[in-house]
Amino acid sequence: MKWLVLLGLVALSECIVILPLKKMKTLRETLREKNLLNNFLEEQAYRLSKNDSKITIHPLRNYLDTAYVGNITIGTPPQEFRVVFDTGSANLWVPCITCTSPACYTHKTFNPQNSSSFREVGSPITIFYGSGIIQGFLGSDTVRIGNLVSPEQSFGLSLEEYGFDSLPFDGILGLAFPAMGIEDTIPIFDNLWSHGAFSEPVFAFYLNTNKPEGSVVMFGGVDHRYYKGELNWIPVSQTSHWQISMNNISMNGTVTACSCGCEALLDTGTSMIYGPTKLVTNIHKLMNARLENSEYVVSCDAVKTLPPVIFNINGIDYPLRPQAYIIKIQNSCRSVFQGGTENSSLNTWILGDIFLRQYFSVFDRKNRRIGLAPAV
């Protein structure tokens, strides 16, 4: 049965829409270059997202490490924006031309008066993130992702933004479940699905490891050229986040974290891997990593001798080699593992782009599951 489903998805590859993504310098890298990273990190907190009417809280959404962005258009005629395709949130928003925050002066803004298809919904919105906040109002307009057209799409227009000044994108396009969205709005993926934009309600990510170009997000099917072997399917453990159950995390044959099972979010909105601080510290001890300016570093000479970190998910091992989880920046070799999720109600981990670069990922809304396979 698994093979029949796989063949069905591959057969749809001729009908899918593939949108290029570009790898940008992250805010973490920018802050590090300006010696401002420590102050920023001290202000961050991580908790699971929740929704309350027109106020949406995503404290776990920290765009400090967002690297991959793509272009969409809004309005008639189209106005183009660079956005994060984010599996960790469900809202679409861009800055409004009347926004007065400094962040809006360095990003593209939407002008409602220049769009003949724009309609103001009027409801005020507030979205809290771990790394900032936006306030504004809801509008409706035609949104295009490549050849996909989402008519009368609800989206947020920010009038105030805090914490988004140096980020390499204008707005965010959320791909999580509707339960994470602003009340009485339909996320763009669901709107496209309901209008028959694709026959299979799936999207997938291929994230290139090193080059700025070559990464893609695809809608409506799967292109098998981007992965090796077969897709292993993992059921989603709850229906708001793209969250799965993980069996354990091990190094050198010894379970180092998640010994009794835990939850993990697959998150295209961050590059890092986050977990409870105590468990992340255990992993760093096995690396002989030391804390330096709020980040863990190892000897660059020792990287090739480090063992893989193995994530066992649904009975399948997903190893992460040291060349993937250690990043060399100038003469320093830094771990991508970060603590801070212990404030969540579950023993939650966040597997960001560092993990997803190694594994092609398919997000299947209809069957509420995620497929993983080694990326080419």
Curated annotation (Swiss-Prot):
Name this protein carries in UniProt: Pregnancy-associated glycoprotein 2
Keywords tagged on the record: Aspartyl protease, Disulfide bond, Glycoprotein, Hydrolase, Protease, Secreted, Signal, Zymogen
UniProt signal peptide: 1-15
EC number(s) on file: 3.4.23.-
Predominant subcellular localization, coarse grouping: secreted
SUPFAM superfamilies for the chain: Acid proteases
Domain Peptidase A1: residue ranges: 68-373
GO molecular function annotation: aspartic-type endopeptidase activity
Glycan-bearing residues: N51, N71, N114, N248, N252, N343
Organism: Bos taurus (Bovine)
GO biological process: proteolysis
Post-translational modification: N-Glycosylated; the glycans terminate in either N-acetyl-galactosamine (GalNAc) or N-acetyllactosamine. Terminal GalNAc on Asn-linked glycans is greatly reduced prior to parturition while lactosamine-type N-glycans remain unaltered.
Disulfide bonds: C99-C104, C258-C262, C300-C333
InterPro entries registered for this protein in UniProt: Aspartic_peptidase_A1, Aspartic_peptidase_AS, Aspartic_peptidase_N, PEPTIDASE_A1, Peptidase_aspartic_dom_sf
Localisation per UniProt entry: Secreted, Extracellular space
Highest taxon of source: Eukaryota
